[in-house]
């Protein structure tokens, strides 16, 4: 019987690129929030490691983050790297939704179960950091976190003594454009001054302020360079969304709605367009 693990995507609630670091990466600050759009990875025991994928355009060799995660976990735990993995891909990649990083994190969790190993959370986090800056977020249980450094220094977000969860309905629209993160960083202008307090802003749950103050520094260069992203953002702004933003470095844009009915109406209005969409209703 195969073991299975879901790999949920994320959105960014604000994203500030603060400075370029000596190692070539950038220091950022953002709030990451897990969503219910997810891939699924299954694993069955095998003598060697292999990967298949429902999306034939994705690599299934060592370029795939799932296999990188598998090999690094096997090395860290000193066990043979054997499993037949299958990735059922639902979340678009190259969209700023963290799907590749989430797939890697899910692979680490899944193979720890399959191989009956119990690495510490610190070991998993260290492996995750070698794969991608978003991987540590997907290895934590908290649904939302304030992220700094490369995006891998995390403080779980809480409100009124409980884990923070987005109280609004979320509609994501993804145009048919993939954006490489290094390309986006080459076009962004870092800035440290006059930044709002992202944590306080998010925890306020004040959508009337979010649309103006919850900014993403990638939005200006990405929407200028890629008309499809700008068109998706314009389409969402034509709905009753109270806040519209880019996720990560794009290409996904999202709208937040006070009422689920308004989000469902917006979803219908986007159907004629060349967009992949996903609706996450507000929690009851």
UniProtKB/Swiss-Prot annotation:
InterPro entries: GHMP_kinase_C_dom, GHMP_kinase_C_sf, GHMP_kinase_N_dom, IspE, Ribosomal_Su5_D2-typ_SF, Ribsml_uS5_D2-typ_fold_subgr. ATP binds at residues 92-102. One of its GO terms (biological process) is terpenoid biosynthetic process. Gene3D superfamilies: 3.30.230.10, GHMP kinase, C-terminal domain (3.30.70.890). The keyword ATP-binding applies. The keyword Nucleotide-binding applies. Its EC number is 2.7.1.148. Pathway: Isoprenoid biosynthesis; isopentenyl diphosphate biosynthesis via DXP pathway; isopentenyl diphosphate from 1-deoxy-D-xylulose 5-phosphate: step 3/6. The active site is at 10, 134. Keywords: ATP-binding, Isoprene biosynthesis, Kinase, Nucleotide-binding, Transferase. Pfam families: GHMP_kinases_C, GHMP_kinases_N. Catalyzes the phosphorylation of the position 2 hydroxy group of 4-diphosphocytidyl-2C-methyl-D-erythritol. Belongs to the GHMP kinase family. IspE subfamily. This is 4-diphosphocytidyl-2-C-methyl-D-erythritol kinase.
């Amino acid at each position: 019987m195969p073991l299975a693990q879901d790999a949920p995507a994320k959105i960014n609630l604000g994203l500030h690129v603060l400075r370029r670091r000596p190692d070539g990466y950038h220091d950022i600050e953002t709030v990451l929030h897990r969503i219910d759009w997810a891939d699924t990875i299954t694993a069955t025991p095998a003598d060697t490691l292999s990967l298949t994928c429902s999306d034939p355009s994705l690599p299934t060799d060592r370029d795939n983050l799932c296999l990188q995660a598998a090999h690094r976990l096997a090395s860290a735990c000193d066990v043979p790297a054997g499993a037949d993995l299958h990735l059922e891909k639902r979340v678009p990649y190259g969209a700023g939704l963290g799907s590749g990083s989430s797939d890697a994190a899910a692979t680490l969790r899944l193979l720890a179960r399959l191989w009956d190993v119990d690495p510490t959370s610190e070991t998993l986090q260290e492996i995750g950091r070698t794969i991608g800056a978003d991987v540590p977020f997907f290895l934590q249980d908290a649904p939302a976190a304030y992220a700094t450094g490369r995006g891998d220094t995390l403080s779980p977000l809480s409100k009124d003594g409980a884990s923070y969860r987005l109280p609004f309905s979320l509609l994501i629209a993804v145009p048919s454009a993939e954006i490489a993160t290094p390309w986006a960083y080459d076009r962004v202008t870092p800035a440290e001054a006059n930044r709002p307090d992202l944590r306080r802003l998010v925890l306020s749950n004040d959508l009337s302020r979010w649309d103006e103050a919850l900014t993403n520094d990638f939005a200006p260069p990405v929407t200028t360079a890629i008309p499809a992203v700008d068109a998706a953002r314009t389409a969402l702004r034509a709905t009753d969304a109270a806040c519209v933003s880019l996720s990560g470095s794009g290409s996904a844009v999202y709208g937040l709605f006070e009422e689920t009915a308004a989000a469902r109406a917006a979803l219908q209005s986007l159907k004629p367009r060349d967009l992949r969409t996903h609706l996450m209703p507000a929690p009851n």
